[in-house]
């Protein structure tokens, strides 16, 4: 698992491939890395209406044939009190209430296709996985 720390790359933007620097997925896959672990905001973008959708970075990781583990779901505290801070930065416009946590999990699981989500409070991801029949 290769940890992605966007703060190490000036101007990292999950929607701009030219900004990914050392974390560009295809060169990492070419080196034999099979799993990337970027933070939440690198994997989702605002969609139409109030939806979250996979980011360009998430799509590039999947195109490179890599698995994804992400972090950290509930590090930001209540979403409704500040739109999630750093971890939800890419979707501030659609993450406006505490239910956004489940919207994030659903987008990551169903559309991005992550293999795992690190969370400070595992009850949220466990509840989601049990409801959705995810093993």
Enumerate the language-model features and the residues they cover.
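Catalytic cores of phosphodiester-bond hydrolases, prominently lipid phosphodiesterases
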Residues: 1-135
């Amino acid at each position: 698992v290769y940890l992605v720390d966007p703060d190490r790359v000036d101007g990292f933007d999950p929607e701009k491939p030219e900004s990914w620097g050392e974390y560009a997925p295809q060169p990492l896959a070419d080196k034999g890395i099979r799993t990337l672990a970027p933070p939440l905001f690198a994997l989702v973008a605002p969609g139409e209406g109030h939806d979250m959708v996979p980011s360009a970075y998430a799509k590039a990781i999947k195109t490179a044939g890599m698995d994804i583990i992400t972090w950290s779901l509930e590090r930001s505290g209540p979403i409704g009190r500040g739109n999630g801070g750093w971890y939800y930065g890419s979707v501030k416009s659609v993450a406006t209430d505490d239910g956004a946590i489940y919207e994030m999990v659903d987008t990551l699981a169903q559309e991005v296709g992550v293999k795992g989500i690190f969370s400070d409070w595992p009850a949220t991801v466990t509840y989601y996985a049990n409801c959705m029949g995810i093993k």
